[in-house]
Amino acid sequence: RLSFPKYHLPEYDFFEVAQDFDFVNNSAWLLTKQVFTYSSNTKKRKASGITSVTFKDYELNKKFDKKYFGPEMSAASRDAYLRDSAFWASVRTEPLREKEVKLIHYTDSVRAVINSKAYKDSVDDVTNKANWKNILYKGQTLSYHERGTRYMLPSVASTIAFSFGGFRTQLPFIFYKIDSLKRTISLNTNVSYGYLNRDINGSVQLTRRYNAFNQGTFNISFTRDFVAIFSGDAWINQLKRSNYYLDNAIGSGWSREVINGLFVKANFSMSLRRSLAGYKTYGIVDSAFQRVLQEPTGNAPSFEPYNALYGDVEISYTPFQPYIREPLEKIILESKWPTFYAQWRKGIPRLLGSDVNFDYNELGIRQHVRMGLVGNAQYTIKTGSFLNTKDVRLVDYKWQRRGDPILFMNPNEAFQSMDSTFAVFKRFYEGHYFHEFNGAILNKIPLFKKIGLREVAGGGFLI
């Protein structure tokens, strides 16, 4: 019998494991029963449970084919979730307690109500009912469960935007649909009007997941908007006028899992890039930003209009990727192996009037590792370089971002202590490590677990 210390449990207040062993076939002491007892107390609810597992019919010294234990951890057929209580009574290794029987009857009743048409209709009625909170700042959702559709309409607050060139009125809209085979389609649109320059911007993106098992997905997008030269830059640089240009773009993408663990993504896009040097801005806003930044915000960069056609391909592979097979989808689990990936981005010259001409490639590995009581870790190691730089525009540079002042960044994505943003053209080697201790340190201090503080650490290198 083993009980874990409370301060080592991020999700529970009590967790105990009891094990029974028996001398099987006069050959070996083996586990025959395992009981997990656990409970959790929070401000909102109290929960407790017991899970019993029985082991029997051992076959000792059995020889298995090398491919017998594959990456598929379990599989469920379509009728698995339709089994009644008689079936479970026949396969359950020990009888249920009276309290457990009552709980099952209660949950079965609740599930029957939740899955009934009348209940789903009532949920739709509540969701679709307009009220002042939805109208003013939350936004209005319209749900129709029989069709599997949802519409998300903007609130009054969300129609007000401030962007390059001043205040704008925008109308965002989202449509989402899922069918009985868990195939989905979503439409995300936004149209905005700028008062100072009397211009119209907007975007439309259509995404279709046509296969839920191999994650087969394609998308099409149209965009006219103000875009940052380096969208991943520090927030303090995002305030500068000199970081923006006007992008008129059309793009398409496709991705799917080819074999277990092997994913392929491909994207093509065409951009008609234009300078914002002639756009009007609010002088009072520029002055305010200059005081905050303690340096000139600069003007939008002036450049000759040009077109750019791109092709992107990424191949990623996770060896021995474990998964669960559900009736309509595949659930990917964390692997003990890292994910290896390769990216190639091509600036395609001449075709459709494109002016860019470059090749950039990147290789790397990434992984999320569960380390038991010590916590969880994430790391990324990558290297990249331009193989061809015949015509690389400012927007296409490979940037290393500066650290954010005041705010801390994710150590797995950037370098906190870097004092400036700069471009790299030669091969670089970059690594990041991020560790979340899950209370391994703070939970040992009385009352700290209830506060909800998190301890994290990380670091990186760039060569």
Where are these regions (language model features)?
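Gly/Pro-enriched, hydrophobic low-complexity segments
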Residues: 1-70, 382
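Exposed, low-structure sequence patches enriched in small/polar residues
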Residues: 76-463
